[in-house]
Every structure is written in structure tokens, then in C-alpha cells.
From Swiss-Prot:
This is Exportin-T. Coiled coil: none annotated. Belongs to the exportin family. The keyword Kinase does not apply. GO terms for biological process: tRNA processing; tRNA re-export from nucleus. It is found in: Nucleus; Cytoplasm. Keywords: Cytoplasm, Nucleus, RNA-binding, Transport, tRNA processing, tRNA-binding. GO terms for cellular component: cytoplasm; nuclear matrix; nuclear pore. The lineage of its organism: Eukaryota, Fungi, Dikarya, Ascomycota, Pezizomycotina. InterPro entries: ARM-like, ARM-type_fold, Exportin-1/Importin-b-like, Exportin-T_C, XPOT. Its main location: nucleus. tRNA nucleus export receptor which facilitates tRNA translocation across the nuclear pore complex. Involved in pre-tRNA splicing, probably by affecting the interaction of pre-tRNA with splicing endonuclease. GO terms for molecular function: small GTPase binding; tRNA binding.
Length: 1014
């Protein structure tokens, strides 16, 4: 069998074997994995002499490992396997001849096998495990030492690695094994570490590295005194202090520092932790490391050792976090607290040195502990002088770290990744600065004020010679200053601004505008300038004399040669004029003339091979990005044109001057678009979007806004009616295009704000175009949402138009509701359409337009309408519950609208005042047979769970209201109907229904009924 297994392995891993043979070989090997006897053959293949090929031995060990790990072997078999491997190891690893030992990948697999054997045998059948392998590591036997260290590392990974999730039984087993190791062998293992370090510190760095890594792993779960002693310290300190004359990387030194970090990170009592930090002489170690050539003399050169800086930063971060944790502990004794405060003073300079390191990776490493420190200081009620003195150097380090370094070149394509990483670091630093402000707001205010003030003074002296990085830093701080000066910003939200900070900010803004910084050459500064103007737009409300100058700068910068400045400025220009439209004055003519060269639209169809993974600068060059930016300009034109300072006639003139070229362009491209030309279709799409966006700028208050809307001026409405007509022509001829319909729908929603009631006569055309046979359910839902807004805003004028358009509208919607479903996306769209449909009908009732639904023009749809509402109400599928609730509310409103007056009211002995008199003949019977029935259909649905679902509870509340309403409209007719349906079970229900107007008792009755049916 051994020859058969060996042959199968050779065939399976032989590149020249046929696929058929390989398949047979792998199938055979897979069978071996579940064969309870295969491991015995495999151990022979692994240990035999002369040895089999490496692949045969490796696969043999895998099969053995699988058998051991799956617990397929009994104790006797495990002991036999142990003896076989020990004999093999005795032959192979007891000689100091590297040539005969296994290669690394086989050693790894062998180590795994031995680790599994340790797990199952150490307790009872192999108590000498550690001693057996340590014995092999004696007498300078390097192969034995390496195998011993591999095994120790593997044992930790198997039983003590906290990063691995384990089953409860396995976790208990591992815990027991750790206890057993501590009891039997931990002292021996610790002794072996000192022995190996003593022997190999100046001979074999690989062995030293392995030993240090193992100490770092094991220290988290062993008695710390086994590691923290003079002998071990005497071995570790020289390794930490090793110097490399060549200035190259020293892995041993770095790992030794990491070992100290692991030791420091061990959980222990506060007093013990402080004593340990002192005993380990960590202050001296870190001071010497930071003063060593790799981190001091070679700073700023290619020899600077970033790896060493990072491991030292990890150590300092661990120490500082532990010190802060001790200080936060209210139960710590005074002596320990005093020592911790002294250590805090000792280590803070080292922390700030590493935080200020030119390499951001080093800085990021200590941010967690600095965050911990600032969080602790925020909790201290009255800051002692020793703590207060820490804040200025911390703040200074934070702010200086926000500066672009000397090697950075803003905006270059090949440095975009570095810049993105720096900006991400800036965000983290900003949080730290906020934390400092939360501790001492006045300190931050003074520091930032001085920094910005000094910057403007330097700019006045040096002008264009000033380093852009210093300007950028000061402007960035000015941007952040608002979190001190403005309300509801910063870590501690305030309802009122800080008056001193607000005054300082106003002074900064005045200096900035007066400084001429908008003419500075560097694009980063120009972007900061515009961002600040937009952020602090409220400054210009009280300093309107600055607006013309800033507006002139914006108009100039929207033409800037740098693509990032240019495209970003289009958005910022819109933000600026939109927030200050009441203050900018009559400047539209000048603005339009100045930016008219940026308004012509040139649609470009993206190529199929366009790079989806382009950088931000490249995407700014794309035609699509340029067009999106142009839309900001069109809206900005609308904003500056529609100011209160601009006569209405001029507003209309400006609108016409911008739209006429668009109309002409649309006419030119329409025929080509009808013929299917992709570029022409995209051009018309862009033109429609531009017209809608221009209208959005003119509209002072968006449609649907809760603020009362004024009817737009007739001159403005007339101009945009022309735009609406032009769009409708395009929609009529191109409505099979998804892109065109999407653009038209967007434009329609924006035009509503400037058309006012002039849109109403056009509604049938909009419905015809936007609800074509090509329209998706999603499009129908979005259009219904727009119609809801129109009904709400024009309820006094829309009745006749609604009467005219309702039948074709409902027929389109009914068609969408009845379409077959294909896939999850289709189901989601159908749910949305159901919800918007019943919401639309609800809005009709809420705005007293219910009569339209049963008018002469629409009564033919009445049955379909009610039937569709029933269908939505009864659908309790996931995602449809909200629509069901609205549908039941619609039914309730139908009863109120058409059920006639109440003829009975709840009480002890209610008496009807007369027969039912519905406004629609026969509606009382319709309510009893249909409305009442749909309620009970839902109550009997097994998926209806109002006791556990909030929306279902709301549906139940609507059902209770409907039952009460039907009874109050029909009195005895309802009672007889219920008694015929429920028999004697109806008595309790009717008593609950007829004695009170409150819904809750009836809801509770229904809940009890449903609970009893389970």
C-alpha cells in the first residue's frame, strides 16, 4: 500500500501527468484522508530512510495531521505516532549538520503534527514533551534549537492566540493546557529562553529573532516574573541597544523593542504596571533609541530608520496608554498615582517627538495614546498646572503635523495617493485638535488666532514668495476656527456662538479678503480661499461691502487653468451666490457675460474602453464631470438672476438670454437624436438637464417646501413655459430613451417652482410622455411622487386638470401594478409603485379632491380603483406593510367621503337617528360586503403579526377605525351583517365596538382574538 500511496502522490503532483491520471490520483488521496489505517502507511513514508521525495513526505504528513486533528486516532495510536516521530527526530535533528534536516516547509508541517500530538497527549501520555525537545536543543545543536523554537511558537498559536475564535469546549481544553504548562514546564521554558539568548546573541540572529518573538507571544499568559528579572533584562538591553555601523535595518533590535512592547501590554494591576515600567528602564531605553543615529543624526536623510521609529512608537504608545489607564482608575492609591503622573511627564516629550515624525506611519502609531491622554484630560474637572502645561506643546505638535511636508507637490497625478493619505491623516489630527479645544477652548482660540494673524502679516511682507504650505496650514486652521466661533459645531455642540471667537473670525475674514490672497498663484490656496468664503457666508451678510470683490474673484477663478480649481470653483460659486442671493444685488448681467463662455454644452459619449479606475484629476477631465460642473453654473446663473434687487423684466431677459442658445441647440440635434444618434441624444439630455437646473436657481422656494410659496411672476413663468414646451417636444419624440425620460423627469420637478399653476394645462402631456409604455415601475413611482407635490401645492386650481388626466394616469399605473415580476429588483420597484400609488390617492382625499375619483369622466375606473386599493391592503409581504397601512387609511377616507353622515354614535345604549344615506347610492352595502370583508381577510392572514411588528400594529389600528366608521354610517345593517358572519362570537366584539369612540379597546380585542388563534 505504501508504494501505491507514494505513486499516487507522485502522479498527482507531476506536471506531465495527464488530467485523467491526476483526477484518479486525487480521488484516491481524498479517500485516504478518511481511511482510518492510512496514517500508519504515511508515517512510514515520512520517516523511512533513504527518504521519499519531498512532496510525498509533505502529503503524508498532511494525511497524518488530518487523522490526528479529527481525533480519528485512539491513545495507543497517538503514542505509537509519538514514538515514531521521536525516533525520526532523534536521527535527523540531533546532529549539527544542516544538510540532513528537513527543509523549512517540511519543518512547518512536522511542527504542526507535533503540536497536535502535544494537545492530545501532554496531559497524560507525554508529560515530558517540553523536556524531550529542549534536550535536542542542547550542546549547540542548531537544528534542534530551531525545531524547539518552532514548536513553542506553534503551541502558542494553537492554544493561546486570542485572534482566533474557538468553540467553548476547545477554549476550555486550551485553558486547561495553559494551566498545566504553567504548573509543569513554564519555569523550564523561561530558562531555555535565557539559555538560548545567552548562547546565540552574537552568533545567530535568526535564532535570536525567533526567541524574542516567542517571548513576545507567551508573555501575555505566563507569570511575568519569569520574564521580568535581571538576567532577562541583561540579555534584552544589549539587543535593544545594538548599533548597525552600515546604517541598515537591524531586525533583531526592532524585534527586541517589540518584545518590550508585548511585555508592557500585559494586563496587570495598576501598581504592578507602574513598577514594571520603572524596572524595565523604559524611559532610558526610549531616550537612547531616539538619540541614536538612525533616529537622530540621520533624520531627513535616506538612512533614517523608519522601521525602528515605528517599533519605538508602538512601545511609547503602549506605555502612554497604560499610564493614562492608571490615572483614569479612581481606585488607584496616591503613591501609584504620583508615580504615574511623573511617568506621564517623562514620556510625553518622546510621544510628541514620534507624533511629529516626518513619516505619517510613525505619527499614526502614537495617535491612539494621545487620544487617550486628551480624553482623560477632558474628564478632569479642574485642570492642575502640570496637566495644563502639557496642552500647548501638544496643540503645537498637532497643528504643525497638519502642514504639507517639504517634499509634497500638491495636485500632481503621481502623488495623488500620498496626498489622499495625508488628507486622511489631517482628519484624524482635526479630531485631536477638537479634543484639545474641549479641554481648553481659550488656548486653541489664541493659538489659531496667532497662527492666522502671523500668516497674513508674513503674506503682506513676502507676497508671492511666501511658502504655500504655510499659507495652506493657516487657511486650514481658519477653516477649522468656525468650530469655536459658530453655534452647534465642535465636540461640545453649543446653541450660541462664542462671541470672542466670532469676533476673531470676523477679523480674520476681513484680513483675508483685504490681503489679496485670492491672487496667490498656488491652486491649493485658491481652493482654500473659496471654501472659506462659502463656509463663512454669514460674515458677508453683515459685511456686504466685501461681496462684489469676492464675487469678482469667484468669476475669475471659475476660469482657472488648473482643473481641480476650475471644477470645484463651479460648485463653490453656486454655494456662495445661493446662500447670499438676498445680498448679491443686481449683478446678473455682469456674471452672465463673464461666464457665458463656460455655458455651451458639448456632450461626449464615453468610449467603451474608458478607464473606470481613473484618478480624481483624470475624472475631472472627463466630459461627464465637466457637464456636472456646468449644471452648478446654470443654477448659479438662476440664483443671481432672481434676486430681489433685479427687476422682474430683467430677470426674464436673463433667463431668455441663457435659454435661447439651448433651444437652438436642441433644434439642431433633435432630428439626429430621433434617428438614434447617441451623441445627439446625450446632447439633448444635457440641454434638458441644464434647463431644469436653471429653473431650480430661479425658484426661491422648492416645490413641496413647508414655507408658503409665492406664485412666480408672470414674466418668469412665461419664459419657463417655453422651456417646458421645448422639453415636452423632445420628450414626445424621444420618450423611448431612458436617459431622456430621466432628464425630463428631473427638469419637470425643477420647473414646477417657476411655472406655478401654468404647469397644470401641460400635465396631460407630461403624463403622456413620462408614463409611456417604456416607463419602468420605478419611473411611475417617482412621477406619482411629483404629482403628490403638485396636488398639495395647487389643490385650489387642479380639480379640472386632475379630472381630465386621472383616467389615463390610473390606467398606466394599473398596467404597471399588473406586470409580471422578474427578479428581486422588479419586486422592489413594484413595492415602491404600490406605496406611491396609494399615497397619491391618499393625497387626493387629504386635499378634498376625492370627488374627482367618482366624476363623470372617471367613474368608469371606480371599481378598478377600489379593487386595486383592496389588493394593496391585503398584501402583507415583507416590504409592503407601509403600503398596506396607507391603503387602509385610504379606505377609511373613502368611507368618510362617500359613506354619508354618521347615524349612530358609541355609548351605553346607542340608537340610530335614521337610515344610512351614502353620497353614492348603494355604497352602504358596498362597505359591508367589501370594506368589512377586506379587514377580516387581513385579520385571518397567518402572516399578520401586530403583536410583534409596529407597522402591522398601525394597520390593525386602521382596521379598528374602519369597523367603527362603517358601523357609525350603517348602524343595524352592520350589526346584522357581523352577527350573520360571527354568530354568538360577535357579542363581545360588538359590545367593545359600540360603547366607546376610542380605538384602543377594539385594537386590544383584536389582539386577544389573534393571540387565541395561535
Amino acid at each position: 500500500m505504501d508504494a501505491q500511496i507514494e505513486n499516487a502522490i507522485e502522479v498527482a503532483w507531476n506536471p506531465s501527468s495527464s488530467q485523467e491520471l491526476k483526477g484518479q490520483a486525487f480521488e484516491y488521496l481524498n479517500q485516504l484522508r478518511v481511511d482510518p489505517q492510512a496514517w500508519q502507511v504515511c508515517i512510514g513514508l515520512f520517516t523511512r530512510s533513504p527518504p521519499a521525495s519531498e512532496v510525498v513526505r509533505l502529503v503524508s504528513l498532511e494525511i497524518i495531521n488530518n487523522a490526528v486533528h479529527s481525533e480519528a486516532l485512539d491513545a495507543a495510536s497517538l503514542v505509537y505516532l509519538k514514538q515514531s516521530l521521536l525516533e525520526y527526530i532523534g536521527r535527523t535533528y540531533t546532529s549539527n549538520t544542516q544538510s540532513q534536516v528537513d527543509p523549512a516547509h517540511l519543518q512547518n508541517k512536522l511542527t504542526q503534527t507535533l503540536t497536535y500530538l502535544f494537545v492530545f497527549l501532554y496531559r497524560e501520555h507525554w508529560s515530558s514533551f517540553v523536556q524531550d525537545f529542549y534536550a535536542i536543543a542542547q550542546n549547540d545543536n542548531l537544528p534542534g534549537v530551531i525545531l524547539y523554537l518552532r514548536i513553542l511558537s506553534s503551541i502558542h498559536d494553537e492554544i493561546a492566540d486570542l485572534m482566533l475564535s474557538r468553540q467553548e469546549q476547545e477554549a476550555k481544553r486550551n485553558s486547561d493546557l495553559k494551566d498545566l504548562i504553567r504548573e509543569r514546564d513554564m519555569a523550564k521554558i523561561a530558562t531555555s529562553w535565557t539559555d538560548i539568548l545567552s548562547r546565540y546573541s552574537n552568533q545567530h540572529d535568526g535564532v535570536v529573532e525567533m526567541t524574542l518573538k516567542i517571548i513576545g507571544k507567551w508573555v501575555s499568559w505566563i507569570d511575568i516574573s519569569l520574564v521580568i528579572n535581571q538576567q532577562m533584562l541583561g540579555l534584552l538591553l544589549p539587543l535593544v541597544g545594538r548599533s548597525n555601523a552600515s546604517g541598515g535595518e537591524d531586525k533583531v533590535r526592532d524585534i527586541a523593542v517589540d518584545t518590550f512592547t508585548e511585555i508592557v501590554s500585559k494586563k496587570m494591576k495598576a501598581s504592578d504596571k507602574i513598577e514594571m515600567i520603572n524596572f524595565l528602564q523604559l524611559r532610558e531605553i526610549i531616550t537612547e533609541l531616539l538619540a541614536s543615529p538612525p533616529l537622530n543624526e540621520w533624520k531627513g536623510t535616506s538612512q533614517y530608520d523608519t522601521d525602528l521609529a515605528e517599533v519605538v512608537a508602538k512601545l511609547v504608545n503602549a506605555i502612554m496608554s497604560d499610564i493614562v489607564r492608571v490615572l483614569e482608575d479612581g481606585k488607584v492609591d496616591n503613591d501609584t498615582r504620583a508615580k504615574a503622573e511623573q511617568l506621564l511627564q517623562y514620556f510625553l516629550p518622546s510621544l510628541l517627538r514620534l507624533f511629529s515624525d516626518e513619516y505619517d506611519e510613525v505619527c499614526s502609531t502614537v495617535i491612539p495614546s494621545l487620544t487617550d491622554l486628551l480624553t482623560f484630560l477632558r474628564k478632569v474637572r479642574t485642570l492642575p498646572a502640570t496637566y495644563a502645561e502639557m496642552l500647548p506643546p501638544i496643540l503645537n505638535a498637532i497643528v504643525l503635523k497638519m502642514r504639507y511636508d517639504e517634499t509634497s507637490n500638491w495636485g500632481l497625478e503621481d502623488e495623488q495617493t500620498d496626498e489622499a493619505e495625508f488628507l486622511e491623516l489631517r482628519k484624524r489630527l482635526q479630531i485631536l485638535q477638537k479634543s484639545v479645544a474641549a479641554v481648553d477652548e481659550n488656548l486653541c482660540m489664541e493659538f489659531m488666532s496667532n497662527l492666522v494673524g502671523n500668516m497674513f502679516s508674513t503674506l503682506q511682507q513676502q507676497g508671492s514668495q511666501m511658502d504655500w504650505r504655510d499659507l495652506d496650514l493657516a487657511l486650514h486652521e481658519m477653516y477649522l476656527f468656525g468650530e469655536l466661533a459658530l453655534p452647534n459645531m465642535g465636540l461640545a455642540a453649543k446653541s450660541q456662538p462664542n462671541p470672542v471667537a466670532a469676533e476673531r473670525l470676523a477679523l480674520m475674514m476681513s484680513k483675508m479678503v483685504d490681503s489679496g490672497i485670492a491672487n496667490y498663484a498656488h491652486p491649493a490656496i485658491l481652493l482654500q480661499y473659496m471654501e472659506i468664503c462659502v463656509r463663512y457666508h454669514s460674515f458677508f451678510e453683515s459685511h456686504q461691502n466685501y461681496i462684489p470683490r469676492v464675487l469678482e474673484n469667484f468669476v475669475r477663478l471659475v476660469h482657472h487653468e488648473h482643473v481641480r480649481v476650475r471644477t470645484r470653483s463651479w460648485y463653490l460659486f453656486l454655494r456662495f451666490v445661493k446662500t447670499l442671493r438676498a445680498q448679491v444685488g443686481n449683478v446678473a448681467k455682469t456674471v452672465i457675460e463673464s461666464i457665458s463662455d463656460l455655458l455651451p454644452i458639448k456632450a461626449e459619449v464615453p468610449s467603451n474602453d474608458a478607464d473606470d479606475d481613473m484618478s480624481s484629476d483624470e475624472s475631472d477631465h472627463s466630459a461627464d464631470a465637466v457637464f456636472n460642473g456646468q449644471l452648478y453654473l446654470f443654477e448659479a446663473v438662476g440664483c443671481v438672476s432672481a434676486t430681489s434687487a433685479t427687476p422682474v423684466a430683467d430677470q426674464a431677459l436673463y433667463a431668455r438670454s441663457v435659454m435661447e442658445p439651448l433651444f437652438s441647440d436642441m433644434s439642431v440635434h433633435l432630428e439626429r437624436a430621433k434617428a438614434g444618434d447617441a451623441q445627439a441624444i446625450l446632447q439633448i439630455h444635457h440641454i434638458i438637464m441644464a434647463l431644469g437646473t436653471l429653473a431650480n436657481g430661479f425658484a426661491d422656494t422648492p416645490l413641496g417646501h413647508t414655507k408658503a410659496r409665492a406664485q412666480p411672476a408672470q414674466e418668469i413663468s412665461a419664459e419657463f413655459t417655453r422651456a417646458s414646451e421645448a422639453i415636452l417636444i423632445a420628450l414626445n419624440q424621444l420618450n423611448t430613451s431612458d436617459e431622456i425620460r430621466a432628464a425630463c423627469r428631473s427638469a419637470f420637478s425643477r420647473l414646477l417652482g417657476v411655472l406655478g399653476s401654468a404647469v397644470l394645462p401641460q400635465l396631460p402631456q407630461w403624463i403622456e410622455g413620462l408614463l409611456s409604455r417604456s416607463s419602468s415601475k420605478d419611473e411611475m413611482a417617482m412621477f406619482l411622487r411629483l404629482l403628490e407635490q403638485i396636488v398639495y401645492n395647487f389643490k385650489g386650481e387642479i380639480s379640472n386638470i386632475l379630472d381630465l388626466l386621472l383616467t389615463p394616469l390610473l390606467q398606466r399605473v394599473f398596467g404597471g401594478l399588473s406586470e409580471p415580476i422578474n427578479g428581486t429588483d422588479d419586486e422592489i420597484q413594484l413595492q415602491e409603485l404600490r406605496r406611491e400609488y396609494v399615497s397619491f390617492v391618499q393625497v387626493i382625499f387629504m386635499n378634498d379632491l376625492g370627488g374627482v375619483l367618482v366624476s363623470a369622466a372617471n367613474q368608469g375606473n371606480f371599481e378598478s380603483l377600489v379593487s386595486s386599493i383592496f389588493s394593496v391592503a391585503k398584501n402583507l409581504n415583507h416590504g409592503n406593510l407601509v403600503a398596506s397601512r396607507i391603503a387602509f387609511n385610504v379606505l377609511s377616507r373613502m368611507i368618510t367621503q362617500w359613506g354619508g353622515p354618521d347615524i349612530i354614535t358609541p355609548g351605553e345604549n346607542p340608537v340610530a337617528t335614521g337610515p344610512p344615506s351614502p353620497t353614492i347610492p348603494g355604497f352602504e352595502q358596498f362597505m359591508l360586503s367589501q370594506f368589512h370583508g377586506v379587514c377580516w381577510d387581513v385579520l385571518q392572514d397567518g402572516g399578520f403579526r401586530p403583536s410583534s411588528d409596529a407597522t402591522s400594529r398601525q394597520i390593525l389600528n386602521e382596521i379598528a377605525g374602519i369597523q367603527q366608521a362603517i358601523w357609525m354610517k350603517t348602524a343595524d345593517l352592520y350589526i346584522n351583517h357581523v352577527q350573520n358572519q360571527l354568530g354568538q362570537d360577535s357579542n363581545d366584539f360588538l359590545r367593545t365596538l359600540t360603547t366607546t369612540t376610542a380605538r384602543k379597546p377594539l385594537v386590544d380585542w383584536f389582539l386577544a382574538l389573534l393571540k387565541g388563534r395561535k
